[in-house]
Amino acid sequence: MRNLILVGPMGAGKSTIGRLLAKELRLPFKDSDKEIELRTGANIPWIFDKEGEPGFREREQAMIAELCEADGVVLATGGGAVMRTENRQALRAGGRVVYLHASIEQQVGRTARDRNRPLLRTADPARVLSELLAIRDPLYREIADVVIETDERPPRMVVLEILARLAELPPR
């Protein structure tokens, strides 16, 4: 396995699960959004405000291309990374892809107090999350080697299921 890549919506647990997986596998953990923030010296909401979503997505595409060239990392992506064909191709080629699926209710609960989510600056975040998932779910599934449900499950149990499911896959 070159890399282990986590995709899924906001609030699915990609960063939390990714850190635990990296520790378990003794691999470095990278979060594409955090890497963008480190490189630019600006947080994601500021980038959205100054460059708009298209500007952020350009930065994200470059970061994903770079991170997928690595060897032996656990990578958590932003929820919208799958929207670009180039990202989906890079993620698929970059390693094993795990789709962490979470219900809208779980996503709302996990993101409610997070001010770093520009797309959720709205009166009705559940509606926005529902609309985003309707568009993105087929794209997550398109590139996923494994789909894992995260609702009402402790992160450690999710990690154990991911490792077990990946062990069952034939080499590629």
From Swiss-Prot:
Pathways involved: Metabolic intermediate biosynthesis; chorismate biosynthesis; chorismate from D-erythrose 4-phosphate and phosphoenolpyruvate: step 5/7
Residues annotated for substrate binding in this entry: 33, 57, 79, 136
Binding site for ATP: 11-16, 117, 153
Cofactor(s) for this UniProt protein: Mg(2+)
Top-level taxon of the source organism: Bacteria
CDD domains documented for this protein: SK (cd00464)
Reactions accelerated catalytically: shikimate + ATP = 3-phosphoshikimate + ADP + H(+)
Cofactor: binding details: Binds 1 Mg(2+) ion per subunit.
Listed HAMAP family: Shikimate_kinase
Gene Ontology CC terms, in alphabetical order: cytosol
Name of the protein in question: Shikimate kinase
EC numbers for this chain: 2.7.1.71
Gene3D superfamilies, per the entry: P-loop containing nucleotide triphosphate hydrolases
Quaternary structure (record): Monomer.
Function, as annotated: Catalyzes the specific phosphorylation of the 3-hydroxyl group of shikimic acid using ATP as a cosubstrate.
InterPro entries assigned: P-loop_NTPase, Shikimate/glucono_kinase, Shikimate_kinase/TSH1, Shikimate_kinase_CS
Pfam families hit by this protein: SKI
Lineage: Bacteria, Pseudomonadati, Pseudomonadota, Gammaproteobacteria, Pseudomonadales
Chain residues that bind Mg(2+): 15
Compartmental location: Cytoplasm
Example GO BP: aromatic amino acid family biosynthetic process
Keywords: Amino-acid biosynthesis, Aromatic amino acid biosynthesis, ATP-binding, Cytoplasm, Kinase, Magnesium, Metal-binding, Nucleotide-binding, Transferase
Protein family according to the UniProt entry: Belongs to the shikimate kinase family.
A Gene Ontology molecular function term of the record: magnesium ion binding
Major location (coarse): cytoplasm
Protein's gene: aroK
